[in-house]
């Protein structure tokens, strides 16, 4: 809520507020001008201009708006104009500290249909996806009753804001962190949500789950990006994240101990996430900080297929150790 103490100018056909000072519930100040024209308070139209400085500009819980919820403190301008049939919001803001926003574009009732890390029958998965022809984002405009609302947000996102992108509300996969970039958000009571712009993740974590057995927080590397091109479901992600641990290199093969100065070595489990939010591709890799190039070359000789890399990642994340395959290591040793 907002409060003000100032003069209201009234006449027979209009109500006016002229550059008054308003205060949000946290005591932050802004300036508002309003012109409300009417004919006996019917056939009305209005124009509101807002100049805010670190003010509470958005505050919605998940029930009010399940797609975009949280609190936004921002500085900038907003214009609201309309009548009894149509109301337009044009907002140009820069995020400020204490902003915490949640983006959830997955339908909780059908989130598993878009689970991109799962072991299921592909034909069954395709049938399930086809059966969800009703776009989950239509929740924005469930009714056509009342005045139509059209909203256009131009946002300058700064690292002050905490942003959480929910990938899978059932499994708990989510990207949480701080970002920078420019973002345009358009939606209304009779139109689908559209988003445009590039967001660069400055720091954050990817809460990764696999079959709801593994739950690990991967640290997102600087330079990871999310590009919005309209439909949020088709946002393009390029995420690189790591999970640090220490493991016994001898569990992979005893011969590797000859190249390593110690038994337990630092290991980075690397997760690469690329593609559309709806169904990104995921791949894994391993890095060995503080180890020499020859040791890494020898390790990659044992782990030379995608299946073996995935198996090693699962073992490292679940058991904190390398997977040992005697037949496989024997063949690899013979080749070397």
Q: What is the predicted role of each segment?
A:
Residues 1-324, 336:
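Strand-loop-strand
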């Amino acid at each position: 809520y907002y409060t003000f103490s100032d003069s209201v100018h009234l006449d027979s056909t209009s109500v006016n507020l002229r550059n008054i000072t308003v205060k949000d519930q946290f005591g932050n100040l802004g300036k508002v001008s309003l012109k409300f024209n009417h004919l006996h308070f019917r056939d009305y139209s209005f124009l509101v201009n807002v100049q805010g400085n670190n003010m509470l500009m958005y505050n919605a819980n998940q029930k009010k708006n399940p797609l975009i919820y949280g609190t936004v403190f921002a500085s900038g301008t907003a214009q609201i104009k309309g009548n009894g049939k149509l109301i337009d919001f044009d907002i140009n803001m820069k995020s400020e500290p204490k902003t915490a926003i949640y983006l959830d574009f997955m339908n909780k009732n059908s989130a598993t249909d878009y689970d991109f890390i799962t072991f299921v029958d592909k034909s069954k998965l395709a049938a399930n996806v086809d059966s969800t022809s009703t776009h989950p984002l239509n929740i924005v405009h469930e009714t056509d009753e009342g005045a139509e609302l059209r909203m256009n947000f131009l946002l300058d996102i700064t690292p002050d804001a905490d942003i959480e992108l929910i990938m899978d509300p059932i499994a708990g996969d989510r990207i949480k962190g701080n970002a920078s970039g420019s973002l345009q958000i358009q939606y209304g009571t009779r139109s689908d949500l559209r988003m445009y712009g590039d967001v660069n993740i400055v720091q954050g974590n990817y809460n990764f789950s696999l079959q709801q057995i593994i739950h690990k927080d991967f640290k997102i590397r600087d330079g990871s990006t999310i590009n919005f091109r309209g439909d949020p479901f088709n946002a393009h992600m390029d995420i690189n994240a790591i999970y640090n641990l220490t493991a016994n290199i001898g569990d992979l093969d005893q011969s590797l101990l000859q190249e390593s100065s110690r038994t337990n070595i630092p290991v980075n489990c690397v997760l690469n996430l690329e593609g559309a939010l709806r169904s990104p591709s995921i791949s894994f890799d391993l890095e060995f900080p503080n180890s020499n190039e020859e040791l890494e070359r020898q390790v990659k000789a044992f782990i030379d297929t995608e299946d073996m890399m995935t198996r090693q990642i699962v073992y490292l994340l679940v058991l904190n150790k390398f997977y040992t395959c005697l037949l496989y290591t024997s063949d690899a040793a013979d080749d070397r």
